[in-house]
Structure formats: structure tokens, C-alpha cells
Amino acid sequence: MQTYLVGGAVRDYLLGLPVKDRDWVVVGADAQTMLAQGFQPVGKDFPVFLHPETHEEYALARTERKTAKGYVGFSFHADKDVTLEQDLMRRDLTINAMAQDADGKIIDPFGGQRDLAAGILRHVSPAFAEDPVRILRTARFAARYKFEIAEETIKLMRQMVENGEADALVAERVWQEFAKGLMEKNPRKMIEVLRECGALKVLLPEVNALFGVPQRADYHPEIDSGIHTLMTLQRAADMGLSLPERYAALLHDLGKAKTPSDILPRHHGHDLAGVEPVREVNQRLRAPKHCAELAELVCRWHIIFHQVGQLKSQTILNVLKKTDAFRRPERFQTALNVCIADTQGRLNREHTPYPQRAHWLALLEAANQADSGKIAAECRAQGKAHLIAEQIDRARLAQIAPLQKAFRAAQDKTEKH
């Protein structure tokens, strides 16, 4: 019985990165051997055990065979005769198909170290095509390390998409990999890889449809709506924004794919037009509620947020109410963060100031100075409970108006200079 450290732990060790989780493979043993040594069985589908002291996962070396479409259609074989190389061969990429023995020696039968040094993601064997999740995982690794995909691997990924393997993916698994990819250092790269292999058209056709749709060059020097979306997503990542914010950044302009061709490159009403496509994506991916709600909010209101300097005080109050800013100020603030990414996610606009965010937050703070509890009590005492909402609005407007007037004056002064 021999144990080897495998997979991501070996890869990250060779890259000089912190090793978070350690997985082990056991060669020359069976389930009875593991149980006799005090290991606890935990694998539902595979022979995986927890070490009695470290609680790290130890899996028996195994081979796999495809039995049906999708990522669950597999049968496996694990016994004492399965070799380390056979176990490594079933893995997805060469950089994940390395092992380290007890003496620290690296076992690398498929050239993983070479590909790490070259910054290449390459599949281990044709068995890569048996699991469609590997399309998403490869795109995610590209986003993490900014590696390129080997030509033969991207070709195989295209074939998998053409054969309908991506259609067999279930929403939960897509979201799991997709969310991880959005939180990588270079999420733009994930979307680019998915587009290159054709999977984006299957998994996120609404995003794929943005590529080739022109925008006004004075607002968007990058011209292409798809490129702007990638730049906005990447800017959100560079800002260190959260998963809901990055997800909203990706979906904020879906309405531009709905713009009638006769008015291009203008996109009047794309904020409203994008709401339904955002809902469709949310439903298809079964996005968590906090991600789905923020994506819809940003899509619907980002243009209004940008144009705050042009709004009347009553309109501002209406927006604060409709976006639920009084009850959910944190979500309101995250929506404004995405608006910064939208503004700066344009060619040569990475450092464009966005005073609108601070102004919206100041407007919300000012409106909250109106003592709604006191106003409600006074109205009830006067037998005018039906006027509570109206009186609260009036008090809030009294707080908003001077602030908005000062902002517009400062804006006019800046424009004149």
C-alpha cells in the first residue's frame, strides 16, 4: 500500500502557491484495508476515506468508464491492481495529473510540469471528452492562471459542444463552476474560453449575443458590446468586488442584444429591455437569490444611476423607493459599485471618476434624516393616518432638494471649464 499526494496540491506547490486542500490517492489497497487502518468511508459514489487523524481525503486508485451523457454517467473500477498512472490518466488536465510520493519526488507521466512552465492547459487523454464539466473547469483554470488552452484541447472542447455534451450539464453544476470562475483573478478569460469553444452560446446565449453589437464610440471607444461586457466584468474583479457584483457586471447590458438594428449604435431603453433576459439567465442557472436580485437591479437602473445629475428631486426619491434603498442600503451600495465597473470598463477609461456613487449615497443619507417615526406619530395624533406616506415623502424631498441643487451646480461648473 502506497499513498501519493495528487492533483491541485501538487500543481499549486510547483507554482509556489499556498496549498489549501490536500488530496491523496492510495495504490495497492482495497476498502477492507482502509477500514482496518481506521479510515472512515465518506465517498457516496467513489471509494473515498477520511484519515483517522488529519481527516484529509484518501481515495483508492481507480479507473473510470463512460456509460451515459453528462457528468454523472460513469462507472468506476477500484482495486489493488489499479496503478498510479492509470488513476492519473483519468484526470482532466496535465497540470492536475501529477503526484508526489512520501520522499517528495514528483511523478509526472503526462508532462504537467512542462505545461505549467509554458502556461498551457492541455487534456490528459481523449477521456477528457467524457465529462462536460471539464469544459467549465478548463475555462475556470484559464481565468485563475491566465494560461492558454492547447490547440488540440480547444478543438476537443468544440467537438464536445457540437456533440451536445454541454446540453447535458445540470444548472447546479454549471453555477458551481461558473461562480468559482467569476471569482478568479481574470474572469474575463473564462468567458473568452467559453466563447472560443462554443459553450457560451449554449450556456449563456444572452451574453454571447452581445458580441458584434456596436455601441456609440464617444461613450464606448471599444465599440463592441461584448467586449465592453468583458471589460466591465474584469474591472469588477480588479476592484475586488463580490460574486453578486461580478455576476451583475456580466449581465448588466443584456438589453443591448435586443436593440432594433435601425437605431444602432444607440441603445435607447436597453436597461428595460435587459430585465427579461436577466431573469431568464437567473432561472436557467438557478442563481442564488442575492445574485439574481442584484443582477436584475443593476440591469434595470444602471442608466438612471449614471444620470443622477439630470434628475429632479422627485425622480430621485422615486428611484430610492423603487430600488428599496431605504430598507436595503447595502444592496443599493453594491449596485453603485457595479456602476463604477461599468463606467471604467471601457477602452482607456479605467480611471474615470464616478462621483455619482458618493452623491447617491449622500442623497440616501439625507433622505433618511427625515424622521418617519415622528411624522407617522404626528399624523395619527391628528387623525390623518392616511397622509403618513405623503408627509414622509415631503420631508424626504426637503432633504434631497438642496443636495441635488448643489450637485447640479457643481456639475455645470465643471462642464463649463
From Swiss-Prot:
The record lists the catalysed reaction(s) as: a tRNA precursor + 2 CTP + ATP = a tRNA with a 3' CCA end + 3 diphosphate; a tRNA with a 3' CCA end + 2 CTP + ATP = a tRNA with a 3' CCACCA end + 3 diphosphate
Q: Which residues bind CTP?
A: G8, R11, R91, R137, R140
Q: How is the cofactor bound?
A: Magnesium is required for nucleotidyltransferase activity. Nickel for phosphatase activity.
So which cofactors does this thing need?
Answer: Mg(2+); Ni(2+)
Instruction: Name the Enzyme Commission number(s) assigned to this protein.
Output: 2.7.7.72, 3.1.3.-, 3.1.4.-
Q: Which GO terms describe its molecular function?
A: ATP binding; CCA tRNA nucleotidyltransferase activity; CCACCA tRNA nucleotidyltransferase activity; cyclic-nucleotide phosphodiesterase activity; magnesium ion binding; phosphatase activity; tRNA binding
Q: Which SUPFAM superfamilies match?
A: Nucleotidyltransferase, Poly A polymerase C-terminal region-like
**Residue span(s) of domain HD:** 225-326
Residues binding ATP, per UniProt: G8, R11, R91, R137, R140
**Gene Ontology biological process:** RNA repair; tRNA 3'-terminal CCA addition; tRNA surveillance
Q: Recite the UniProt keywords alphabetically.
A: ATP-binding, Hydrolase, Magnesium, Metal-binding, Multifunctional enzyme, Nickel, Nucleotide-binding, Nucleotidyltransferase, RNA repair, RNA-binding, Transferase, tRNA processing
The answer on whether this UniProt entry bears the keyword Lyase reads no
- A Pfam family found in this protein is HD
Q: Does the record bear tRNA processing in its keywords?
A: yes
| Residues the entry annotates as binding Mg(2+) | D21, D23
Its biological purpose is as follows: Catalyzes the addition and repair of the essential 3'-terminal CCA sequence in tRNAs without using a nucleic acid template. Adds these three nucleotides in the order of C, C, and A to the tRNA nucleotide-73, using CTP and ATP as substrates and producing inorganic pyrophosphate. tRNA 3'-terminal CCA addition is required both for tRNA processing and repair. Also involved in tRNA surveillance by mediating tandem CCA addition to generate a CCACCA at the 3' terminus of unstable tRNAs. While stable tRNAs receive only 3'-terminal CCA, unstable tRNAs are marked with CCACCA and rapidly degraded.
Q: Which NCBIfam families match?
A: PRK10885.1
Other facts noted in the record for this chain: A single active site specifically recognizes both ATP and CTP and is responsible for their addition.
> Could you describe the subunit structure of this protein?
Monomer. Can also form homodimers and oligomers.
Q: What is known of its domains?
A: Comprises two domains: an N-terminal domain containing the nucleotidyltransferase activity and a C-terminal HD domain associated with both phosphodiesterase and phosphatase activities.
Record-stated family: Belongs to the tRNA nucleotidyltransferase/poly(A) polymerase family. Bacterial CCA-adding enzyme type 1 subfamily.
Mind telling me what this protein is named? Answer: Multifunctional CCA protein
